[in-house]
């Protein structure tokens, strides 16, 4: 966007004319922007020359100064235009204001020397006056040569020495020390911030690694526990399947044979009368052994055509009872069959691995002990 000189045009023009007019004490005028806009306003005017002007330049602003000085060679008034861009101005603002320099030069026309400055060393009064002297040197020599024939005896050569302003010098040195200290402090601050940022970064990285390590260890622990649990279930299932598939005659402990041997060794009761031809030998032996129990409980009738049948309900006189955990199919007529959750009553623990009892179907026989759980 272009610079706006019309909003405060009257004040801008009046200050400019005061500097041009040798009859006024005002010998410098300073211009700047209103905030971040492109509107130019009058910042300050004064009559203290370059020494006073440079004290008003701000490191955080873009400013334009127009100053009247006296040519050290000819003593004639000369005009200096200073385009000031402080070191603290943002780069985007610098780029925008750079396009306004030519417009300001056209407005503050008549300058013999133009200076583009960014730091205090660019606007030292001695340096500016040297540039003014060099700019007017050719014209000055021309005028001197043209008037040399009319001059009388030459007097002492005048000196261009200017008395040092003590207060101005103190201020200048103080500002130099101030800015040097400020730059040093700023550099130390940046170094400290960078160090703190690195420390914080290292801390976060260390915490992240520790957290990831803990999570990995926890996952490994859970994995081992789960694997152990799965292996236990698998072994248990394999054992159950093995028990189901191996015939009773091939099991490592065959309590059924032991049971049959015990039955054969018992003496036959003489009170039992001869049975009809329908009774098998195994049924006769079984009835001889359990005659007393069956008579007391009245579980089955003395009919040779049917197998003994027992009540399946869990009554007070049902003896030891158990609930089936798995299904089991009898290998022969000396064993009983049952399904999961069936209740087996009148259990006798004849062996660590094999018991016998009455199944829900009413049949009495042996079954594997690890297929059931006892009921309280």
Swiss-Prot record:
GO term, biological process aspect, one: positive regulation of dendritic spine morphogenesis
Predominant place of localization: cytoplasm
UniProt subcellular location: Cytoplasm, Cytoskeleton; Cell projection, Lamellipodium; Cell projection, Ruffle; Cytoplasm, Cell cortex
Topology in membrane: Peripheral membrane protein
SMART domains: ADF, SH3
A GO cellular component annotation in the UniProt record: actin filament
Renumbered residue ranges of the record's region Disordered: 202-288
ADF-H domain span: 2-133
UniProt-listed Pfam families: Cofilin_ADF (PF00241), SH3_9 (PF14604)
Biased composition (Basic and acidic residues): 202-242
Coiled coil: 175-231
Biased composition (Polar residues): 268-283
Domain SH3: 317-376
MF GO annotations: actin filament binding
Annotated keywords: Actin-binding, Cell junction, Cell membrane, Cell projection, Coiled coil, Cytoplasm, Cytoplasmic vesicle, Cytoskeleton, Endosome, Golgi apparatus, Membrane, SH3 domain, Synapse, Transport
Family: Belongs to the ABP1 family.
Function: Adapter protein that binds F-actin and dynamin, and thereby plays a role in receptor-mediated endocytosis. Plays a role in the reorganization of the actin cytoskeleton, formation of cell projections, such as neurites, in neuron morphogenesis and synapse formation. Does not bind G-actin and promote actin polymerization by itself, but excerts its functions by interaction with other proteins. Required for the formation of organized podosome rosettes.
PANTHER family recorded: CORTACTIN AND DREBRIN, DREBRIN-LIKE PROTEIN
Protein name: Drebrin-like protein B
Species the sequence originates in: Xenopus laevis (African clawed frog)
Lineage summary: Eukaryota, Metazoa, Chordata, Craniata, Vertebrata
